């Protein structure tokens, strides 16, 4: 931890104090309704059984009906299967996360099924990552042209117009790049899901960009460590960063317009899922 000249007992006490604060933060009750939930992954190196493995640190941020955003969860794991995501979503539901209408994330394997099973919300595939994935099917020399064509769908005022535009663009591009056309066919509904929500909110719910600054700070702190000795050390460091960021957010103005929240259909009280697992700590 860079604490040279300090006794082991003092370091242990400092670590315990941090663990207690982080644990209380990550397991705090969540009141009210949270229509929007962003999930994003940062990949870190951890020692495990004499090997160095890559683990996913999933950060969850949600916006409530008062227009404020909070960091609502952290989950660490070596896998991104449906059970991994379901465990995380259930742990947040146990703490009171309810009323979720839209989950925004990259296309992680197993997540979509877990959202449908645990949360029952719509899913918005991160538009930024979607565009990168789409352009991977296009030669570099022609990516600017393809990008400009695809973006025409995203400036439309509503979902029917956006869908019609994207279908038209896909049909034009598939003659040159059939795999791109197939990719658009498969992902159209997911990348346009945010258009079913209030126009005032769309700039913040079409991608995971609202987490970009937070993830950069997490990565900056993690790079100092390099390889973490165990999962607990990851939770300690990242949890402390998240706690600090969340405190700063609470001093800021509302993140989203509250007037538009009234356009969202109120949710019935969500039943707490059974067989709930807690957040990794």
Residue ranges of model-derived segments:
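Amphipathic alpha-helical interaction elements
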Residues: 2-3, 77, 116, 120, ...
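RNase H-like nuclease fold core
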Residues: 4-104, 109, 113, 117-121, ...
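Conserved phosphate-chemistry cores used by DNA topoisomerases
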Residues: 16, 32, 70, 83-90, ...
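Generic structural signal for alpha-helix starts
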Residues: 139-140, 198
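Acidic/histidine-rich catalytic cores and adjacent linkers
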Residues: 152-281
């Amino acid at each position: 931890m860079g604490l040279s000249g300090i006794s082991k007992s003092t370091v242990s006490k400092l670590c315990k104090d941090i663990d207690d604060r982080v644990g209380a933060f990550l397991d705090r009750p969540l009141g009210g309704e949270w229509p929007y939930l962003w999930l994003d992954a940062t990949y870190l190196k951890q020692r495990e059984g004499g090997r160095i493995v890559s683990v996913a640190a999933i950060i969850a941020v949600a916006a409530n009906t008062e227009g404020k955003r909070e960091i609502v969860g952290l989950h660490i794991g070596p896998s991104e299967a449906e059970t991994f995501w379901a465990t995380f979503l259930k742990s947040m539901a146990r703490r009171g996360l309810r009323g979720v209408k839209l989950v925004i994330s990259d296309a992680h394997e197993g997540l979509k099924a877990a959202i449908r099973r645990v949360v029952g919300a719509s899913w918005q595939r991160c538009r930024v990552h979607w565009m990168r994935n789409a352009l991977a099917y296009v030669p570099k020399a022609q990516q600017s042209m393809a990008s400009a064509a695809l973006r025409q769908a995203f400036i439309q005022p509503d979902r029917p117009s956006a869908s019609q535009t994207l279908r038209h663009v896909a049909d034009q591009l598939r003659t040159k790049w059939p795999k791109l056309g197939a990719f658009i066919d498969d992902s159209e509904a997911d990348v346009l899901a945010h258009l079913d929500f209030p126009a005032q909110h769309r700039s913040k719910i079409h991608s995971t960009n609202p987490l970009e600054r937070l993830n950069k700070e997490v990565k900056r702190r993690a790079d100092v460590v390099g390889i973490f000795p165990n999962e607990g050390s990851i939770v300690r460091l990242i949890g402390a960063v998240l706690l600090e960021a969340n405190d700063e957010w609470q001093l800021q103005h509302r993140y989203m317009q509250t007037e538009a929240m009234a356009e969202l259909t109120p949710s019935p009280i969500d039943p707490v899922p059974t067989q709930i697992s807690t957040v990794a700590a």
